[in-house]
Regions:
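Short coil/loop residues immediately preceding or within conserved phosphate-binding loops
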Residues: 461
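N-terminal pre-Walker A segment at the start of P-loop NTPase domains
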Residues: 428-453
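Hydrophobic anchor at the beta1->P-loop junction of P-loop NTPases
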Residues: 466
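Extended, folded cores of ATP/NTP-driven motor/assembly subunits in large transport
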Residues: 1-430
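Conserved lysine of the Walker
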Residues: 474
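Hydrophobic positions on the alpha1 helix immediately C-terminal to the Walker A/P-loop
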Residues: 477
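The conserved Walker
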Residues: 458, 470
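Switch/coupling segment of Walker-type NTPase motor domains
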Residues: 77, 109-120, 134, 138-140, ...
Length: 527
């Protein structure tokens, strides 16, 4: 018989030493847990919108003592302008930024969103007039629809400047805004950009367009508030928000993501914003800009220079102790010292101010894959200019709220820049002309590729000339304009045609031809 052998007891593993956390780390963990638990209350989509009250005159109350106003401005032909004109626009932009002190917050918002498809198509359709040319009108409308699909006219791009101040009450805020807004409008006038102050309903309609990127119709009247018991947030809020994920969120049926621009380039290019906005999807770009007090900015730069000099001295002492030449210092220290001295010189002698800027980008898409592709495209544009587009982690709601054109900034990722460095983000590209009504088709914009529809009777100078080299299409352009006027308006068309070039066109349109020559039977009575 064999005695059963007892299994040998396994050696116990030594318990792992507990990781000791600092007080700051414990507080951070507690804060994250509190945020994850929430406050136990049921929240609605309206709670995300960061303002308390909107007044009919366009004054917005953000909290107890913070108020904002919004200005909409149109585009100018910056990319096609001469270098001297571009410099003038850049300098005017610098003057506008310098005119606002540290008590005024500025938010530059560039919005690219889809217009209501039905409204858009109606603007290019030619109404039937009950004659036997209606089939030509239908063919002409089909041609316009094809041209519409070639460009980005499904997207409308709008630009806004939101100004924010601190004030005790609405009366004080209105009194101060009257001067601030007037100065901003004058600066835009110098740049050649048409600008206007938004009323309360116009501001709400703009926010509704951002929160409903597919172009849903906006329906609201101030008289509806009291009987319905609703707030203005109820009329503009989307059906839902979902901020459960770390790096993206959903707004109704849209997939969205908020990123910030990490500026690491030594020099910036004025085409960056233009390329960033050149997309076929919804996009919201916001730049929060706030100037620093000039004396405080100079003191801050001087302190940085002192710190760098102290680091240089320590590096030189270490080099001497180790037997090296004391003039050999780390390259980064020499670079930082030179840049800091250049900034100090700009602040003291070149009429420059120091600004803190937060650059946010919000992408909207119909699917998760489309959103990721749009983010890659935007990141490649940033990489082209030696910058990085970084997704916000666990700050998507705060980032989206900060990107809305309301003047609220909850993202404290800021970059200090001088006036010239801020103004290089020029918000202008090319002026678009897309009138409705009796507007005529004049081709595609060479810069943006969008359709040009212009009603010259609405312009300051309705007269026009067609200029071009031989064979460039001057006659074709004139004939296209004649056909457009004939099909779309009830205007009279008079053609002086010494070479009888337009005779077949006039005959096809059943016009009247008057022949005047020494041998003709028709005459002009000079009396």
């Amino acid at each position: 018989m064999f005695r059963k052998r007892k299994p040998e007891p396994q050696a116990r593993q030594a318990p792992k030493a507990a990781v000791k956390l600092t007080v700051a780390e414990k507080r951070e963990i507690s804060r994250i847990l509190e945020t994850a638990r929430g406050d136990g209350k049921v929240h609605s989509a309206q709670d995300t919108l960061p303002f308390r009250q909107m007044y009919p005159d366009g004054l917005c109350k953000l909290d107890d003592h913070t108020w904002s106003k919004c200005i909409e401005f149109e585009d100018v032909n910056y990319q096609l302008a001469k270098p001297d004109d571009q410099t003038a626009i850049f300098e005017a932009l610098c003057d506008m930024y310098n005119a606002h002190d540290a008590s005024i917050g500025m938010q530059l918002s560039l919005v690219s969103r889809r217009m209501n498809r039905e409204d858009f198509v109606k603007r290019i359709e030619i109404a039937a007039q009950g004659d036997h040319f209606d089939h030509i009108r239908e063919l002409y409308t089909q041609m316009l629809r094809k041209q519409l699909e070639r460009g980005n006219n499904g997207l409308i791009k709008t630009k806004y400047l939101t100004l924010t101040i601190e004030a005790r009450d609405s009366k004080t805020a209105r009194a101060r805004f009257s001067r601030i807004v007037m100065d901003a409008l004058n600066h835009f006038k110098v740049m050649g950009a048409l600008a206007k102050e938004l009323g309360g309903k116009e501001w709400l309609e703009m926010l509704h367009g951002i929160l409903h990127p597919d172009g849903e119709r906006f329906a609201f009247e101030w008289s509806w508030l009291a009987p319905s018991g609703l707030s203005v947030q109820d009329f503009i809020a989307p059906s839902s928000f979902r901020f459960g994920e770390a790096r993206k969120f959903t707004m109704a049926d849209k997939f969205c993501a908020v990123s910030f621009l990490q500026i690491s380039a030594p020099e910036m290019d004025d085409r960056m914003l233009t390329e960033l906005l050149d997309t076929d999807s919804g996009l919201l770009v916001s730049l929060h800009i706030r100037s620093m007090d000039q004396n405080e900015a100079i003191k801050t730069v001087k302190r940085k220079i002192t710190d760098i000099d102290s680091m240089k001295i320590d590096a030189q002492k270490k080099a001497v102790r180790e037997g090296f030449d004391m003039d050999i210092i780390p390259t980064d220290l020499a670079t930082y010292a030179g840049e800091a001295k250049n900034i100090l010189r700009d602040l003291q002698s070149r009429n420059e101010r120091m600004f803190l800027m937060t650059f946010l980008v919000v992408n909207f898409a119909d699917s998760k894959q489309k959103m990721e592709n749009d983010l890659l495209r935007a990141a490649s544009v940033a990489q082209k200019y030696n910058c990085s587009l970084v997704r916000l982690d666990f700050q998507q709601e705060d980032g989206f709220v900060s990107a809305l054109p309301l003047g609220v900034n909850r993202i404290k990722i800021q970059r200090g820049l001088t006036t010239s460095a801020v103004a290089v983000f020029v918000p202008f590209t090319t002026q678009e002309i897309f009138h409705g009504g009796e507007a005529l088709y004049y081709g595609l914009n060479a810069t943006s590729g969008n359709m040009i529809l212009a009603d010259r009777k609405k312009l300051k100078t309705p007269n026009g000339m067609i200029l071009g080299t031989p064979g460039s299409g001057k006659s074709f352009s004139a004939k296209r304009s004649i056909v457009g006027v004939f099909l779309n308006t009830k205007d009279d068309i008079l053609i002086c045609d010494p070479e009888a070039e337009y005779f077949p066109l006039v005959s096809r349109l059943e016009g009247q031809v008057i022949k005047i020559s020494p041998t003709s039977t028709q005459y002009v009575n000079p009396m």
